[in-house]
Amino acid sequence: MYIPMVVEQSGRGERAYDIYSRLLKERIIFLGGGIDDQVANLIIAQLLFLEAEDPDKDIHLYINSPGGVVTSGMAIYDTMRYIKAPVSTICVGQAASMGAVLLAAGEKGKRFSLNHSRIMIHQPLGGFQGQATDISIHAKEILRMKEELNSILADLTGQSKERIEADTDRDYFMSATEAEEYGLIDATFTRKPDSGGTP
């Protein structure tokens, strides 16, 4: 994938940044694509760096993700909760599966979506093969993760755990407006606010 470069002029001359490094200077992190350990480690490193720079200033996490590995997503989730700096989340395109959990995990009042984004929640996926005892162990772990994610979504959205369990039994797609009504986000935007707004 080609990554654009941005050239900045200063009194010292020119300096070239890749686009993601330039966004990081503005405290913007972009999560685009599937979530795995490598992606999670990059996102976590950026969160920790920005918190070390200024623990009181908002970090803006833009999300366009179909989800991915639950444990990788939970590592990002836990780091968002761990750091002192508030993390604002903005969905652009889609936030599905773990992407939706991370979207909802933003600072309350600072969870946003652009108007035509799609948000989807569901139960964790798993496929295992091997000895029967190993399959049984993995099945128990998937059920434990499902229970944990349902509790997290109930806490983040204000929905009852029973409703979350029913809705995540199958893929549950929402528009940005529906996600706002559900409690996954706090507002939808078609344009960037003129002043003081996060996105």
UniProtKB/Swiss-Prot annotation:
Family: Belongs to the peptidase S14 family.
Pfam families linked to this entry: CLP_protease
Full protein name: ATP-dependent Clp protease proteolytic subunit
GO cellular component: a single term: cytoplasm
The UniProt record lists the keyword Lipid metabolism: no
Organism placement in taxonomy: Bacteria, Pseudomonadati, Thermodesulfobacteriota, Desulfuromonadia, Desulfuromonadales
Active site: S97 (nucleophile), H122
Recorded catalytic activity of this chain's protein: Hydrolysis of proteins to small peptides in the presence of ATP and magnesium. alpha-casein is the usual test substrate. In the absence of ATP, only oligopeptides shorter than five residues are hydrolyzed (such as succinyl-Leu-Tyr-|-NHMec, and Leu-Tyr-Leu-|-Tyr-Trp, in which cleavage of the -Tyr-|-Leu- and -Tyr-|-Trp bonds also occurs)
